[in-house]
């Protein structure tokens, strides 16, 4: 049997990189996919941007250089896990397109997933009120408000979370990754 490019190979890991604004649904989708893949017996790990920043990138700020360093660190860890057969789900804003391309180019079997929701939707979802504070100028360097978010131009999968449910998003992810729905 011949495998297609996006089908998982036995003993071969992959990296699924979820990118998008804060509140778009990256962690929600990645967590739901993690649960589904775990239930199917897939060796899978979730690297959440907030957890990595807290544990591996403590001390970094939110300058472009610091954000790029954080993304590169996440990519390094994801690559190590994937080389050992793990399916790695990365949930990180990763706002700069060039840095994402650079990191993804070093990873085995990368899939870029653009988790997309308009600013008004992510603002409504923001229970901490960070977007409102950023829009009022109280939080500097806030991605999507006072700092840029460079959306992928050609992601492998584009999920509009204001139009689909988490369950539908997971179905689309499973199908795209070759696991069936």
Swiss-Prot record:
Coiled coil: none annotated. ATP binds at residues 20-27. Pathway: Sulfur metabolism; hydrogen sulfide biosynthesis; sulfite from sulfate: step 2/3. GO terms for molecular function: adenylylsulfate kinase activity; ATP binding; sulfate adenylyltransferase (ATP) activity. Belongs to the APS kinase family. Catalyzes the synthesis of activated sulfate. This is Adenylyl-sulfate kinase. It comes from Deinococcus geothermalis (strain DSM 11300 / CIP 105573 / AG-3a).
